[in-house]
């Protein structure tokens, strides 16, 4: 979640704006990601089927999100990608599924390399790398 308010026009400008959101619940996947809170922290066990489950469902999810956002151009390489890096297999399958150029998931791959899959907060690292990439352009 990214929260904020209206920026002060003379001194601030938003880095991101959320225009649409969507979620999908996939039946019979409740054991696919198993999180445990213990005395030493949180640990997760990811099912070996997770990359395939994502690959099988990501296109429908993206079509739904793109439709809600009111976009019509389905050229995935023209889109901005901020993907939670659940693991290399997940990123590889997304890249293949959408025929993405290798740089489209670059921020996700760097975040995964630097921090690993640090649960849901990993997406914040991805967004930070995207900001850094945009400043270099």
Features from the language model and the residues they span:
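Condensing-enzyme catalytic core mediating Claisen C-C bond formation in acyl metabolism
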Residues: 1-67
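Charged, gly/pro-rich, cysteine-poor intrinsically disordered low-complexity regions
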Residues: 71-72
């Amino acid at each position: 979640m990214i929260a904020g308010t209206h920026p002060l026009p003379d001194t601030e400008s938003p880095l991101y704006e959320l225009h649409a959101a969507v979620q999908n619940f996939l039946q019979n996947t409740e054991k696919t990601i198993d999180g445990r809170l213990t005395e030493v922290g949180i640990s997760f066990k990811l099912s070996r089927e997770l990359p395939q489950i994502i690959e099988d469902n990501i296109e429908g999810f993206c079509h739904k999100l793109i439709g809600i956002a009111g976009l019509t151009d389905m050229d995935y390489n023209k889109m901005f990608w901020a993907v939670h890096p659940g693991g290399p297999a997940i990123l590889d399958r997304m890249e293949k599924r959408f025929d993405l150029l290798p740089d489209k998931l670059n921020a996700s791959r760097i975040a995964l390399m630097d921090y690993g899959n640090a649960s849901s907060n990993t997406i914040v690292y991805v967004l930070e790398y995207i900001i850094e990439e945009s400043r270099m352009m």
